[in-house]
Design a protein with these regions (language model features):
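Acidic, polar ligand-binding/catalytic clefts
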Residues: 58, 62, 67-133, 143-144, ...
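Extracytoplasmic small-molecule ligand-binding "clamshell" domains
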Residues: 27-100, 170-174, 261-265
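Bacterial N-terminal signal peptides
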Residues: 8-20
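Periplasmic-binding protein-like
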Residues: 38-41, 110-122, 146-151, 165-167, 204-266, ...
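Alpha-to-beta junction loops
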Residues: 66-67, 85-94, 135-137, 179-180, ...
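Boundary at the C-terminal end of the N-terminal hydrophobic targeting segment
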Residues: 20-27
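Bilobed "Venus flytrap"/periplasmic-binding protein-like clamshell domains
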Residues: 39-43, 47-62, 115, 119-175, ...
Length: 280
């Protein structure tokens, strides 16, 4: 047997062994669920993975046999165009159903804006039509449905204090989402009109005695206060959408537990309400 024949045979054996050892690694390779995350926006997400969306992303990824990989970007205008649509990430959490720039999943919870005040103030305000509101100092997130509704009712002026809903910690860090709730707890405002998950989280965090009234939709006046919340993927990515919806259905109870643990005020999904109305 020649030296060349021996070497050739040895190379064949080594190649076969390398290929055989490589196959299991490929089979066991964990794929990534690439999430568009806000780096500093509790209660929703942060880089320490402490938010609602961080926890839900972990649950969904685990169900799909994947690991979570984040692209951090403040959730402001331009997120879809600059980050999701350029392929830097594949899924956004916590978007309203019907948000047109993306392909959205079936919703995984429903919540809304709340009217909140301290229980020890002796107030009994149940709606935006209560005449007491014209005499109280109201904190409200600007350019939101409750803000518009106050204007429709002529509640404007010095007794209305505006707060930011959208937040970028790189600019105006003092306008963090919980500031309105913390000002309410401190007595800086009498009543707060605030997005429910923000109100519930910061009230629970501070162990504050707050009364929170979920605002009812008023279709006749164009006031919509409750929203179904979905995940969003790039338009056309029906495969990922389907996988996410399947995982959301399987993990419904676990996701609900996460939301309740964060103090999110929950409403029946729109589909459930429609079924209840048509039930015999």
């Amino acid at each position: 047997m020649t030296r060349q024949t021996i070497l050739a045979g040895w190379l064949v054996v080594v190649s076969a062994l390398l290929c055989a050892s490589a196959r299991p690694a490929q089979a066991d390779e964990v794929k990534e669920l690439r999430v568009c995350g806000d780096p500093n926006n509790l209660p929703f997400s942060n880089e320490k993975l402490e938010g609602i969306e961080n926890k839900i992303a972990d649950v969904i990824a685990k169900d799909l046999g994947m690991s979570v990989a984040y692209t951090w970007w403040p959730h402001q205008r331009g997120l879809v165009k600059r980050v999701l649509n350029t392929g830097r990430c594949d899924v956004m959490l916590g978007i309203p159903k019907g948000y047109d720039p993306v392909l959205w999943t079936k919703p995984y919870y429903r919540t809304g804006y709340v009217l909140a005040y301290r229980k020890d103030r002796g107030l009994k305000v149940r709606s935006l039509d209560d005449p007491q509101l014209k005499k109280l100092k109201i904190g409200v997130q600007v350019n939101t449905p409750p803000h518009d509704a106050l204007g429709q009712r002529g509640i404007v002026g010095d007794n209305v204090v505006g707060y930011q809903l959208m937040f970028d910690s790189n600019f105006h860090a003092e306008d963090y989402p919980g500031k309105l709730v913390e000002d309410l707890i401190a007595g800086e405002v009498d009543v707060a009109l605030v997005w429910g998950p923000i109100a519930g989280y910061f009230a629970k965090k501070k162990a504050a005695p707050l009364e929170m009234v979920l605002l009812e939709d008023r279709p006749e006046s164009g006031n919509r206060f409750a929203f179904d919340i979905s995940m969003g993927v790039r338009k056309g990515n029906k495969e990922l959408k389907g996988k996410l919806e399947d995982a959301l259905a399987r993990k419904h109870d676990e996701i609900k537990h996460i939301l309740e643990d964060f103090g999110v005020p929950l409403l029946p999904a729109a589909e459930e309400k429609a079924r209840d109305k048509t039930a015999p």
